[in-house]
């Protein structure tokens, strides 16, 4: 009887629950052609339940009692909210295309265009995607997101340098970094000042001065049809960064705070003091036995008299470290620590028909996992524009950044902290200052360096981009851009008497160095945009550009300080100040450029560009060079026979060819470097000038590196662009590489900068994206990319090695048929 009652109660409850919800069914179709919208989302507003349309566009959703609003969404279509009528169980929906999404605007060089009209290989990342991982710098936000773009962090320290390569390395000795353009203006930095010590390879990240929260979008230009408009600086690709403007509607105030913790996930297993002493003793015994040597046992566990003092001195043995009589040190525990980071962002923005404004501030404090390392940044940005008349608009975008980077000695050839944590003997005392236990000059006490070494980099950066834009009539715009940037880096270094650099007889080592750079850009640009008879669209850009860069540096090194308390703050106290050094230089670049985009029937797309650059870096006869490109694309998905297949929602084929250049050499590489020198004449010494022999002789025949690139690609979209796939195949060859060649020393020199050698890169890039759920409050998508690049050297007269012993790169072999970075061993 009891079981029967429970059964009846469960049956009644089941019927009551079914009565509390209604099953609504229907079909979701395209408003234009009536095709089913596969994968369209249906959500019950306020209930958290929903459904997805099947291959026929049909859906079925349970609507709880009291809920009567359904929300329909699909990629590429406008979202709809529909209220159910009382008792309604069938609801068929037609959805209209979201033209704003379909006509997504992508920034390209010297302009912008609809994504559907692109003929080149361009990848765009929006702010919401960039900020998903809360990156500290822009470079970190790009890691792993774009096919063919390799982001490597040179050093794991906060604020350390990050290198970006697009479609492989093009050169041996010149920079392989892409050109960075911020709001239409080239972004430059003066780099890291030196310390006067070889082997200290710490690097700084210039893009870390830009707050990622200020970014609206980033476009990566990869093929030559997209980069040729930048001529002599586009060979390594171009990264276009657009900062945020004011959002439409009411004034918007936003604040965010982010906190994080970093720590070493897994430390390496190291020998303790007992095991280390045992192995050292065994090594000495084997050496004596098999090499007939007479080496003393390093850990004998015996006493002997010190002849200098007459006292008995005990040398510990392995057992002394096992029983704790003598401490055993794991240097990783002494060097690494848990690091904390905090970041605060405040922004105010707004816009109307008359203009826009966006003002933001950022504070970042990131400590490193190595003791006494970290990075602090304070930044401010103001982006303002105003229409002072219907046909004239003015605006400016200004930013200022102050940062402090406390550098640990983590990327150093000698005496590095990480190296010391792995190689310094576990038997050495924690505060060992004698360095008697130093294995070799590559390894020193890491604990001492985290407490007794100072290396700080202070950076102040100002960047502005201002414009005046005039619209004489509907289809023509004339724009004047003025860009200015100023950067100064100051580096303060002090190694006290506990370190290898500062120990007796050096008695403290101090270095103070700074460098600065300022860059002025003037651009006059005219843009003509016209549509004829609906089937013909033409966009033409013509521009003149002038850029001037000034830079300078100075440095001072001193040793022999009476004490360590004042560190580098009192350089006059040093007994042995070295001769100060300084430098100054200037470069200029003049350019004429143009580009034309033609769209026929929204199916056939054509692009052509041309740029003529003149650089002060080269000698007369080689100052000017031309760079051109062309591209075509076919939007096959607009053809009726493709539409009839009912397979592709987007299908576009692309092909391009173009040439770009590289002028990344010194400002005066084609000129003689002179220094004051004395020379004998008529039996007496006379003062004059002589060549700096280590610089090499002048080479007036130097010319640009030239990169020629072919690219073919296809863009595909399925199920109303819910699934997107992009495939690119490329081949590029860089010729006339700028590098040093050895010359007979009878000339008075040992090497000379010249053009020789080639590098080819060929590869495949595949990018896919799947929109699983799209809605007003919930979005779920998947991204994936993979790329393959093959790099090969050719045109060398013989084998050679990478230059720069202090960088420890002389193990890299450069041989015809082999890739850049080939390591030569024994």
Model-assigned labels for residue ranges:
Residues 7, 14-104:
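Periplasm-facing N-terminal accessory domains of Gram-negative outer-membrane beta-barrel systems
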Residues 28-31, 121-144, 152-156, 165-171, ...:
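Short, polar/charged loop or turn motifs at beta-strand boundaries
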Residues 41-58, 106-131, 159-163, 191-201, ...:
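N-terminal periplasmic "start-of-domain" segments of outer-membrane beta-barrel proteins
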Residues 55, 83-88, 152-160, 212, ...:
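Short, glycine-/polar-rich solvent-exposed loops and beta-turns at beta-strand/coil boundaries
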């Amino acid at each position: 009887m009891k079981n029967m009652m429970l059964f009846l109660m469960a049956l009644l409850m089941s019927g009551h629950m079914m009565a509390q919800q209604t099953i609504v069914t229907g079909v979701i179709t395209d408003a234009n052609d009536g095709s089913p919208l596969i994968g369209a989302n249906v959500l019950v507003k306020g209930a958290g339940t929903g459904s997805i349309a099947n291959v026929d566009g049909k859906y079925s959703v349970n609507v709880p009692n009291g809920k009567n609003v359904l929300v329909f969404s699909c990629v590429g279509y406008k979202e709809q909210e529909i209220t159910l009528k009382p008792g309604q169980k069938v609801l068929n929906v037609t959805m209209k295309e979201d033209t704003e999404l379909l006509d997504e605007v992508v920034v390209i060089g010297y302009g912008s265009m609809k994504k559907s009209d692109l003929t080149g290989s361009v990848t765009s990342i929006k702010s919401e995607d960039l900020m998903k991982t809360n990156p500290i710098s822009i470079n970190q936000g790009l890691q792993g997101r774009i096919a063919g773009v390799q982001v490597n962090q040179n050093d794991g320290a906060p604020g350390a340098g990050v290198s970006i390569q697009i479609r492989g390395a093009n050169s041996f000795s010149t920079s392989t970094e892409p050109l960075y353009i911020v709001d239409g203006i080239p972004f430059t930095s003066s780099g890291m000042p030196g310390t006067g010590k070889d082997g200290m390879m710490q690097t700084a990240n210039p893009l870390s001065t830009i707050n990622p929260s200020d970014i609206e979008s980033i476009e990566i230009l990869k093929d030559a049809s997209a980069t040729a408009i930048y001529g002599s600086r586009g060979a390594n690709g171009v990264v276009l960064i657009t900062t945020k403007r004011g959002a439409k509607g009411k004034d918007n105030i936003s604040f965010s705070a982010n906190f994080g913790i970093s720590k070493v996930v897994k430390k390496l297993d190291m020998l303790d003091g007992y095991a280390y002493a045992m192995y050292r003793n065994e090594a000495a015994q084997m050496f004596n036995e098999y090499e007939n040597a007479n080496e003393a046992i390093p850990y004998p566990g015996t006493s002997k008299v010190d002849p200098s003092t007459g006292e008995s001195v005990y040398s510990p043995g392995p057992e002394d470290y096992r029983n704790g009589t003598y401490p055993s040190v794991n240097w990783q525990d002494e060097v690494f620590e848990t690091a904390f980071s905090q970041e605060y962002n405040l922004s105010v923005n707004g816009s109307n028909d008359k203009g826009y404004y966006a003002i933001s501030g950022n504070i970042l404090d990131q400590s490193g996992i190595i003791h006494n390392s970290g990075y602090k940044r304070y930044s401010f940005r103001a982006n303002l524009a105003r229409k002072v008349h219907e046909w004239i608009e003015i605006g400016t975008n200004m930013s200022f950044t102050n940062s402090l980077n406390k550098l640990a000695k983590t990327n150093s050839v000698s005496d590095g902290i990480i190296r010391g944590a792995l190689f310094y003997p576990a038997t050495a005392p924690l505060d060992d200052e004698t360095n008697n236990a130093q294995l070799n000059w590559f390894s020193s006490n890491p604990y001492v360096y985290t407490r007794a070494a100072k290396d700080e980099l202070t950076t102040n950066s100002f960047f502005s981009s201002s414009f005046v834009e005039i619209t004489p009539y509907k289809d023509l715009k004339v724009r004047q851009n003025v860009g200015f940037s100023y950067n100064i880096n100051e580096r303060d270094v002090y190694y006290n008497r506990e370190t290898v650099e500062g120990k007796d007889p050096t008695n403290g080592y101090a270095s103070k160095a700074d460098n600065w750079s300022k860059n002025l850009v003037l651009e006059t640009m005219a843009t003509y945009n016209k549509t004829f008879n609906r089937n013909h669209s033409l966009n033409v850009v013509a521009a003149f550009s002038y850029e001037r860069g000034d830079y300078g540096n100075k440095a001072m090194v001193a040793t022999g300080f009476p004490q360590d308390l004042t560190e580098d703050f009192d350089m006059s106290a040093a007994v042995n100040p070295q001769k100060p050094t300084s430098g100054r230089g200037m470069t200029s670049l003049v350019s004429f450029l143009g580009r034309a985009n033609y769209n026929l029937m929204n199916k056939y797309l054509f692009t052509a560009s041309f740029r003529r650059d003149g650089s002060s870096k080269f000698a007369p006869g080689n100052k000017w060079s031309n760079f051109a490109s062309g591209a075509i694309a076919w939007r096959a998905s607009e053809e009726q026979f493709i539409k009839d297949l009912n397979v592709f929602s987007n299908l576009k084929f692309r092909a391009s060819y173009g040439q770009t250049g590289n002028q990344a050499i010194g400002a005066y590489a084609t000129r003689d470097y002179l220094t004051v020198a004395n020379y004998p004449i008529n039996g007496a010494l006379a003062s004059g000038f002589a060549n700096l022999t280590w610089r090499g002789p002048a080479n007036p025949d130097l010319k640009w590196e030239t990169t020629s690139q072919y690219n073919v690609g296809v863009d595909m979209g399925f199920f109303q662009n819910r699934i997107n796939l992009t495939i690119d195949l490329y081949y590029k060859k860089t010729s006339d590489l700028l590098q040093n060649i050895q010359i007979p020393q009878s000339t008075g020199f040992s090497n000379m900068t010249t053009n020789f050698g080639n590098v080819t890169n060929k590869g495949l890039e595949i990018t896919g994206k799947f929109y699983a759920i799209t809605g007003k409050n919930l979005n779920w998508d998947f991204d994936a990319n993979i790329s393959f690049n093959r790099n090969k050297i050719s045109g060398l007269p013989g084998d050679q090695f990478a230059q720069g012993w202090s960088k420890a790169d002389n193990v890299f072999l450069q041989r015809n048929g082999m890739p850049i970075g080939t390591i030569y061993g024994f």
